[in-house]
Swiss-Prot record:
Protein name as it appears in the record: Ectonucleoside triphosphate diphosphohydrolase 7
The keyword Membrane appears for this protein: yes
Keyword entries, A-Z: Calcium, Cytoplasmic vesicle, Disulfide bond, Glycoprotein, Hydrolase, Magnesium, Membrane, Metal-binding, Transmembrane, Transmembrane helix
Gene this protein is translated from: entpd7
Record-annotated disulphide pairs: 454-483
Transmembrane segments: 29-49, 556-576
Single GO molecular function: metal ion binding
């Protein structure tokens, strides 16, 4: 190959030579340029896809924000496409009616109805409560429909009249009705089923009026919380926590959003509900029977063949483990123990005000009396939080086995490395009303604050209360029993349910997205789960047609870059083909030259003298 040399008066080692720029080198340069261009285009495509994904994520976040804002706006009853539903919660102390609405289903069998609570023109929730409870109609069941009439009239006034005939009505009775004999329950429900349709045009049948169990109520509450938090939306974003779920005998696990567990401590009872994602094994038939009575497996989807909305939830209610009832149990225990010790040891502790029993669960210096069986036990607050927790340990009634279950009730294990829980009612009041620590729970900070509160003199707490240093919801009852209830909450959470002290995913709350969430939302979600089938069938019966406007923006990008790659690949193949043709021509020229040289030698050979 010919070479082009550059020489100058430099040292010999500086002399250099460059290959001649031939057609081959030009092809190599062109191929290199095309390769770089392809790399740049592919890089741009990947970057654009990531940018699109980021924008899509921000769009979803923005839509969620808009949905939260829309939830607080007045319901547009002029929208003829809206559907409505009514749920009456017949509780022990009173009954409440809730009105819900939802737009037409989007036609995707994997999505649930978008049910929201109706709001009036002032953007207030449409809800009405009456007292006393419907259980007071036990002796006069024929008046049950008259009792509930004001609630239904209230709901009917907010729902467009032409929508009444297609609006389902559910009357669900809870604790107050459960304690009645079955005959009285049936008499009340029969009167409702007979008389309500004569007064109102709602969709209402015998199956729409029932007394639900505590287990059902817990499941509905669990559904409500997770629905509002968006945990049933199976579009998983990068920041969403997921869990692998096994359903029945399926070998492959379903990967979906992690649901939250719910712990609710009221005044009289304690309830816990959480998903059990894996199929359980039991050491004995007895354990299996007990576990099945506390597990609820249900499908929230409209298609029973689809298992992505099948959930297995553990629900248990502990009667007597609420904050106020636990205090009564504690006072009973202290009273009986003190009377017994006084009788055995001949002492007079607590009998007179000048020799009170020191109670570690009351603030320092607080004077109180416990009356049982016409006897008074005088107590004086000692304010020792650790000692209080020790005295509360027997009230947990834990089993003697290795699991040490709360109240000796079986509980499936919780994966504390991949779970999340919300604490409501007393959990929120204990952390927020006085300690002002509601929200994300930290056991060390909570224990420190609780100890400091308990050790404060009662007079100091009164001064702080009068100065407005506590929540507006705090009252004298809260100040008096905060020390006890904080110790009880701590014991329930860590000694009863065995939550690790460093567990990071427990939150105490009163509202979810600034609104109160009722179990009735979960009830209507479950009751109306098959309604989307109607919209899906209507959608499938329409003639299919293609709309270019429905093609995703990202697909256009894919098509654009695919076309560019095809063109570049064609250019590369064309250049390679030219190279092969050029090589063939070069070989042919070399062969011709060789043949010509051989021919010359052949001609010259005869004339050469020997």
């Amino acid at each position: 190959m010919a070479r082009i040399s550059f020489s100058c008066l430099f040292p010999a080692s500086w002399h250099c030579s460059l290959p001649s720029v031939t057609q081959f080198s030009r092809q190599r340069v062109a191929l290199l340029i095309i390769s770089v261009a392809v790399f740049i285009l592919v890089f741009a495509a990947v970057a654009d896809l990531q940018l699109w994904s980021s924008r899509a994520f921000r769009d979803r976040q923005f839509r969620r924000y808009l949905d939260q804002i829309e939830d607080l706006e007045a319901t547009d009853t002029k929208d003829t496409k809206l559907n409505y539903g009514v749920v009456v919660d017949c509780g022990s102390s009173g009954s409440r009616v809730f009105v819900y609405f939802w737009p037409p289903h989007n036609g995707n069998p994997h999505d649930l109805l978008d049910i929201k609570q109706m709001r009036d023109r002032g953007s207030k929730p449409v809800v009405k409560k009456i007292k006393p409870g419907i259980s007071t109609m036990a002796l006069t069941p024929e008046k049950s429909s008259d009792y509930i009439n004001p609630l239904l009239s209230f709901a009917a006034s907010y729902i467009p009249k032409h929508k009444h005939k297609e609006t389902p009505l559910y009357i669900l009775c809870t604790a107050g009705m459960r304690i009645l004999p079955e005959s009285q329950q049936i008499a009340i429900l029969q009167d409702l089923v007979k008389d309500v349709p004569q007064e109102f045009d709602f969709l209402f049948s015998e199956a729409h009026a029932e007394v639900i169990s505590g287990k059902q109520e817990g499941v509905y509450a669990w559904i409500s919380i997770n629905f509002v938090l968006g945990r049933f939306d199976h579009v998983v974003d990068e920041e969403d926590a997921v869990v692998a779920v096994t359903i029945g005998t399926q070998e492959e696990s379903i990967i979906r959003k992690r649901t939250v567990g719910v712990i609710d401590m009221g005044g009289g009872s304690l309830q816990i509900a959480y998903e059990v994602p894996t199929t359980m094994t039991y050491p004995s038939v007895e354990h299996e029977e007990v576990a099945k009575s506390m597990l609820a497996e249900f499908n929230l989807g409209c298609d029973l063949q689809h298992t992505e909305h099948v959930y297995r939830v553990y629900v248990t209610t502990f009667m007597g483990f609420g904050g106020n009832f636990a205090r009564q149990r504690y006072e009973d225990m202290v009273f009986n123990d003190t009377i017994t010790k006084n009788r055995i040891q001949g002492q007079q502790i607590g009998v007179h005000p000048n020799s009170p029993l020191q109670d570690p669960c009351l603030p320092v210096g607080l004077i109180d009396q416990v009356r049982r069986q016409s006897h008074d036990l005088h107590v004086l607050g000692k304010g020792n939080w650790d000692s209080c927790r020790q005295q509360l340990e027997p009230l947990l009634l834990k089993s003697n086995d290795t699991q040490a279950y709360l109240n000796s009730v079986y509980q499936p294990s919780i994966d504390f490395s991949n779970s999340e829980f919300y604490g409501f009612s007393e959990f929120f009041y204990c952390t927020e009303d006085v300690l002002r620590m509601g929200g994300i729970y930290n056991s060390q900070k909570f224990a420190k604050a609780a100890k400091e509160y308990c050790s404060m003199p009662w007079t100091t707490l009164q001064d702080r209360f009068n100065s407005g240093l506590y929540s507006s919801h705090a009252d004298q009852h809260r100040l008096k029993y905060q020390c006890f209830k904080s110790a009880w909450m701590f014991s329930i959470l860590h000694n009863g349910f065995h939550f690790p002290h460093e567990y990071p995913n427990f939150k105490t709350a009163q509202l979810v997205y600034d609104k109160e969430v009722q179990w009735t939302l979960g009830a209507i979600l479950y009751k109306t789960r098959f309604l989307p089938l109607r919209d899906i069938r209507q959608e499938s019966s329409r003639p299919a047609h293609v709309s270019w406007f429905r093609i995703s923006f990202v697909y256009n990008h894919y098509l654009f870059f695919a076309c560019i790659l095809v063109v570049l690949l064609s250019i590369v193949l064309y250049i390679l083909r030219l190279r092969r043709i050029h090589r063939r021509q070069a070989r042919a020229s070399a062969l011709d030259l060789l043949l010509m040289e051989e021919g010359v030698h052949t001609v010259l050979e005869p004339g050469i003298p020997t």
